Amino acid sequence: MAEVVPAAKRERHHAGEFLHGYRVRKWLGDGAFSVVYLVEDPKTHVQYALKHVISEGEKEDRYLDQLRMEWEAGRKLKHPNIRDIVDLRGDQTFGFIKKPGKDLGLVMEMIDAPSLEDLLLKNEPRFSIAQWISIFRDVASAFVHIHEKGFAHADMKPNNILWDRDHTKVIDFGQAWKIGTKKPRMSGTAGYVAPEQPLIDVITAQTDVFNFGATMYRLLRGKFAPQAVQKGYPRDFQLAEDVIGESTPLTQWNPEIPERLSDLVLNCLELEPSRRKYMTFVLKQLESMQPVSVK
């Protein structure tokens, strides 16, 4: 079986070349097994981001499957706080027969904005609590829409939230999965993973609620939530408070944080999924904390 070659080690496409019908403008970045380019439609001159994935062996086919799931979820999602997914190139259809491709390109809305992870690492800008609530409200609104369409994101973290002064956008549905079905592989990112995720259990909306709670905790506190699964936990570990820590209320760290917000974050971080509120409740709580939009 062929060795898996990370995307960063593969030859990149250069400006002016064509890729899946789009003209490459420049390289934007590498994922674990994808390369993202700024591309332009030669007919309309509209610019997009194109995520390019190639499989050179059976081991890498799962990355193609992830891209197809990202397309399946993304094309059904139309929300102002979710990045638009425009097209998937590379698979071929002949009548009722579909021939899977080994070279796929996911065409996405181009967003020129940093992630909250970027801003967190740079320690800029310093958001007010009102601004954080506004951002959290936008993200929760996006998640309500995602869940209504029957999907879970399964990898919420600051790096998957883009922000500028006018927009908040949830991105990267590469780990998305249909709610109520079992995911064959663990998803998520250490420091944000819900306790049930390493068990490769059925994906539910409450998994996203936990991931979002861990994200809010990190952004408000600057540290990872103790309840979130960290790197190195075995997949067969049991849910127990002596294994996974507890978070102290955020109000003890910053008295400017409203008690209702602190309580909401801690509820999202409940170890048992059944004890977490639904995202509709989370959104209503955030909306009630801030009736006026603050950017």
Language-model segments: residues:
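Conserved HxN/HPN-centered segment at the entrance to the catalytic loop
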Residues: K78-F94
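Conserved short submotifs of the Hanks-type protein kinase catalytic core
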Residues: I97-S115
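Activation segment signature within eukaryotic-like protein kinase domains
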Residues: I135-F136
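Catalytic-loop of the protein kinase fold
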Residues: H147-W163
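Conserved catalytic-loop aspartate of Hanks-type protein kinases
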Residues: D208
